[in-house]
Curated annotation (Swiss-Prot):
E.C. designation(s): 1.-.-.-
Protein family per UniProt: Belongs to the zinc-containing alcohol dehydrogenase family. Quinone oxidoreductase subfamily.
Residue positions where N6-acetyllysine is found in the record: K35
Full protein name: Quinone oxidoreductase-like protein 2
SMART domains hit by this protein: PKS_ER
Gene3D superfamilies attached to this UniProt entry: Medium-chain alcohol dehydrogenases, catalytic domain, NAD(P)-binding Rossmann-like Domain
CDD domains xref list: QOR1
PANTHER family from the UniProt entry: QUINONE OXIDOREDUCTASE-LIKE PROTEIN 2, SHORT-CHAIN DEHYDROGENASE/REDUCTASE
Length: 349
């Protein structure tokens, strides 16, 4: 994917064209054609509906789902042209007549689905959460997807207990580092971080992991066994899939739990049911965004918890890189080439 994206990456694609209309225009990144670089265009604002809020966006998080959507490979398809961007932070500019949850000037995080990679975003008021006083807009933008997922995986799905050992793969990514942060500082669990390079393992250790494994050097199961013995780990949070998932599954202790969060390695493994039976282990999935429709109170609580933990200074999101809006294609390439660690943000100001 990185090579295909890179072939088309050219500053020539970063253009601005003024849309006809009145009022103050704003800039937005548009996916006008699948598998092509985004373009930056000037957009004429539309009126807010009674249930909607207009937000002055300061930062927008970049997620792999944004890139997949622009490649036409995401499970949710969008009509072209569209603006990617699943999460943002900013300040309320205007509210619809039926909105009472936020007011002009409030600092908020937003989960609009898409449309966040723009200087302004109009979204339903239910997609916004107020940012506590001690949390910066920059920090807040790094929280929703990564920490919402981490909290849900560890607390709601795996039911992680204090003192348990958690193995997390892709540990230097935004969600991986969030898992380390929450497991260590909120749940008082011990973390083994697994990543694909010594540099990424070092970052994971600096972020609170008790030990690390570079799985590009050999068997993950054998390396974990040397750290914990034959007993195994209690919880696995896996973002990689493929052979790494299978080795992590075989590293579980009796009644261990493995949570599948993603397939960054590109391969979806089949689960050997006999392994579940022999140790009475549980394998489960987590599509965090689905809870918005299926169980909104629980979904919302994961975001409120992330904001509160950050307000209290108990967690600290790691922001690896910040790009300007005009550099959005460079930011996408940075992620697809696996150069990124922690959260990658776009600055809209």
């Amino acid at each position: 994917m990185a090579a295909a994206w890179g072939r088309f990456l050219s500053r020539a694609w970063l253009c601005r064209t003024a849309w006809q209309g009145c009022g103050r225009n704003y800039r937005a990144a548009l996916c006008a054609e699948l598998k092509r670089p985004l373009v930056i265009e000037e957009v004429t604002p539309r009126p807010v509906q009674p249930h909607e809020v207009r937000v002055n966006v300061h930062f927008c998080g970049i997620n792999f789902a944004d890139i997949l959507a622009c490649q036409g490979q995401y499970q949710e398809r969008h009509q072209l042209p569209f603006t990617p961007g699943m999460e943002f932070s900013g300040m309320v500019l205007e509210t619809g007549t039926d909105v009472s949850t936020v007011k002009e000037g409030d600092r908020v995080i937003g989960l609009p689905g898409f449309s966040g990679m723009a200087e302004e975003c109009i979204t339903d008021h239910k997609n916004l959460w107020q940012i506590p006083e001690k949390v910066s807009l920059r920090e807040a933008a790094a929280l929703p997807v990564s920490y919402g997922t981490a909290i849900f995986a560890l607390e709601h799905r795996a039911c992680t207990q204090p003192g348990e050992t958690v193995l997390v793969t892709a540990a230097a990514g935004a969600t991986g580092l969030a898992v380390i942060d929450v497991a260590t500082n909120i749940l008082q669990a011990k973390v083994i971080a697994a990543a694909g390079s010594d540099e990424k393992c070092q970052l994971a250790m600096q972020s609170g992991a008790q030990s690390s494994v570079n799985y590009s050097r050999g068997s993950l199961k054998e390396a974990v066994g040397k750290l914990v013995g034959s007993g195994g780990v209690n919880v696995v949070i896996d973002m990689v899939g493929g052979d790494i998932f299978l080795e992590a599954l075989r590293s579980l202790a009796y009644e261990g739990r493995i949570v599948v969060v993603g397939f960054a390695g590109g391969t979806i493994a089949s689960v050997p049911a006999n392994l579940l039976l022999l140790k009475n282990v549980s394998a489960m999935g987590l599509y965090w965004g689905r809870y918005r429709q299926q169980n909104f109170p629980v979904f919302s609580r994961s975001l409120s918890s992330a904001l509160q933990y950050c307000q209290e200074g108990r967690i600290q999101p790691h922001i690896g890189e910040v790009f300007e809006l005009e550099e959005v294609n460079d930011a996408f390439l940075h992620v697809t080439q696996r150069k990124s660690t922690g959260k990658v943000l776009l600055s809209l100001k």
